[in-house]
Curated annotation (Swiss-Prot):
Positions of Ca(2+) 1 binding: 60, 62, 64, 66, 71
Record's signal peptide: none
Organism: Caenorhabditis elegans
Protein name (database record): Uncharacterized calcium-binding protein C50C3.5
Residue ranges constituting the EF-hand domain according to the UniProt record: 47-82, 83-118, 120-155, 157-189
Length: 189
């Protein structure tokens, strides 16, 4: 499934060991401009912007300032991930916001930071759900979700937002979702 491979690509790319290995392997000379602005806009540290920039440079073999589908394929291969055209298309589709067939640095940074944030949210949600009950078949209501969310996650949600999440997770149309359904829904995001 391309989406899973797309996530596998981003996860492998940002894994500390892989990133460090790739950065050591290639010497990056250019500096990222507007680090402060980008860090603020994408709500990440300056160090994270610099790290992502170095990885971007590694992928930009021709020095064009953009990453092409062939450069994505090459990086997928280096990461040991399936290099089928569908996987490359999934990565390009998830990142190329402008639709020009190339991924510029800001598009790359946006994709990476969204994956980092999503990973954090998923971990928070799983922790939150484990606090509700260890029984994956336990049914939770929107109200229970609001309480558990406020005790675990750094943001609050309203009952209306919780209802929308429950509705999305509820595979049987009963207005409630099991913890298993909720985790499954979170993993498919």
């Amino acid at each position: 499934m391309p989406v899973a491979k797309d996530n596998q690509f981003w996860d492998a790319l940002m894994e500390n060991k892989v990133a460090k290995k790739l950065i050591k392997k290639h010497k990056c000379k250019a500096k990222c401009e507007n680090i402060d602005d980008l860090a603020n806009r994408y709500e990440v540290s300056k160090q994270e912007v610099e790290k992502v920039f170095k990885i971007f440079q590694l992928m930009d073999d021709d020095g064009s300032g953009t990453i092409s589908s062939s450069e994505v394929a090459k990086m997928l291969n280096e990461l040991g991930i399936d290099v089928s055209p569908k996987v490359v298309q999934a990565v390009m589709r998830s990142s190329d916001v402008s639709g020009d067939g190339q991924i510029d640095f800001e598009e790359f940074l946006a994709a990476v930071t969204s994956k980092i944030k999503l990973s954090t949210v998923k971990a928070d949600v799983q922790l939150m759900l484990s606090k509700i009950d260890n029984n994956p078949e336990k049914v939770i209501s929107a109200e229970e979700l609001v309480v558990a969310w406020s005790e675990t996650v750094s943001t609050n949600i309203t009952v209306k937002e919780a209802c929308a999440l429950i509705q999305q997770a509820d595979t049987q149309g009963r207005g409630k979702a099991t913890i298993h359904e909720f985790i499954t829904m979170c993993q498919t995001v």
